[in-house]
Amino acid sequence: MTDPAGLWHRLADSRVLLDGFHALKHAVRFGAEVTVAVTTDREATLALADELAPDVRPALDALLTEVPEPVYASLVPRPHPTAVAALAVRPSRAAHLERLARTERTAPVVVLDQPRNLGNAGAVIRLAAGFGATGVVTTGTLDPWHPTVVRAGAGLHFATAVERVTVGELPPGLLFALDPEGDDIRGTKLPDDAVLAFGSERSGLSADLRARADHLLSLPMRPQVSSYNLATSVAMTLYHWSLDGGV
């Protein structure tokens, strides 16, 4: 590619930023359409692929263009230690919504109700992909495809369905909302097509989502401890689901 920086600038506003080797690796592994990928050291990046991701090494060999460090730094908000970045096409919203709406899902949908922290949202998407969740949807103003979220998610947005919806647009299925006043989750079997909702750490569930919930559940927690990190709560809940046959 003769002018990767020029192509980058033309496409950046309409593409997903993959920031770092692991984000690019996961995106390629899960079928992302990558339109441009750059690195400051092509040989070192391909050696890293040989070591950590030999399955995607041929694809990275075809995609990566080496650029000078100042050029790379000009393309990203904050240089990544691996000095790798790429742009990919965002998956179809319509296809994601169709996938989320299926009534015979084999894994839960995670709902983040009005999340505030971009890093936490990315961490949830990363672990949801690891558990094979059908998808992660957010309500409120946070963009789940924000570059900081994608970076925190290590590119695993492409391994699951990630979208922003309203409470009225939540996927079908029994809605289990995590709330300190709910029943102990250890006494409940979560169905594979469950919709699992989590409020923000600061304000909890919104009134609209809480009113719509079919069941309120709580996580075991020592008295006088106020809350878990959002990603920790999601991980505990998905692990509980997985004990009955998930992942």
In which residue ranges do the predicted regions lie?
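Boundary-proximal intrinsically disordered activation/regulatory segments immediately upstream
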Residues: M1-P54, T141-L142
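Structured adenosyl-cofactor binding patch, chiefly the S-adenosyl-L-methionine
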Residues: A86, L127-F131, T141-P144, T148-H157, ...
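Short, aromatic/basic amphipathic alpha-helical patches
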Residues: A44-A59, T148, D208-L209
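Amphipathic alpha-helical repeat scaffolds
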Residues: G20, R116-A123, S226-A231
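Glycine/small-residue-rich loop that forms an oxyanion/phosphate-binding "nest" at active or ligand-binding sites
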Residues: A53-V89
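Active-site/ligand-binding-proximal alpha/beta "capping" segment
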Residues: A177-P223
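RNA substrate-binding interface of SAM-dependent RNA methyltransferases
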Residues: L87, P91-E181
